[in-house]
Amino acid sequence: MAKLYFYYSTMNAGKSTTLLQSAYNYNERNMNTLVYTAAIDDRFGAGRVTSRIGISQQAKLFNRESNLFEEIKRHLASEKLHCILIDEAQFLTKQQVYQLSDVVDLLNIPVLCYGLRTDFQAELFEGSQYLLAWADQLEELKTICHCGRKANFVLRLNERGDVVKDGEQIQIGGNERYLSVCRFHFKQKTGKLHN
């Protein structure tokens, strides 16, 4: 029985690396996968899932208007699919998460989603919110803060390295823009720590 999975974390926990390893494992056994990534994130070139450790793979793009169920159903007409993998799943809409649940429930294909849980203000992304609510299986991928504690928050930095507290939820960037930290250091750096 297929399931909808959500692998979530803060930045730099290895989400894309884990996705690429999963795709490789399926392909090594002559099983077909379909990999998607968000069109909005073109840091490494449009249509590529790229890991910080240097591995990458071509991927189909999704944007807010994509009907993932219909795209995947059309693809099935030409090729059997054994798994769907979604990178940057935080950028999915509520409707797209529902569409992916239909891929699982109606097409019986497992869907593995990888994404951030929260943004730089510790608020859920739309895609993450509904994956946390509707996924059959949740798994947190862990990374560490500079102090050694588990990092489960992310700070947004400006060009000078100062913490940014306000702004648009979505701003594409990597290590130069974001820093994964523990809850204590998130509160401390954003001025939300009680004295």
Swiss-Prot record:
The gene is tdk. This is Thymidine kinase. PROSITE patterns: TK_CELLULAR_TYPE. Pfam families: TK. It is an enzyme of class 2 (transferase). GO terms for molecular function: ATP binding; thymidine kinase activity; zinc ion binding. NCBIfam families: PRK04296.1-5. InterPro entries: P-loop_NTPase (IPR027417), Thymidine_kinase (IPR001267), Thymidine_kinase_CS (IPR020633). It catalyses: thymidine + ATP = dTMP + ADP + H(+). It is found in: Cytoplasm. GO terms for cellular component: cytosol. The active site is at 88 (proton acceptor). Belongs to the thymidine kinase family. Its EC number is 2.7.1.21. Keywords: ATP-binding, Cytoplasm, DNA synthesis, Kinase, Metal-binding, Nucleotide-binding, Transferase, Zinc. Zn(2+) binds at residues 145, 147, 182, 185. It comes from Mannheimia succiniciproducens (strain KCTC 0769BP / MBEL55E). Homotetramer. ATP binds at residues 9-16, 87-90.
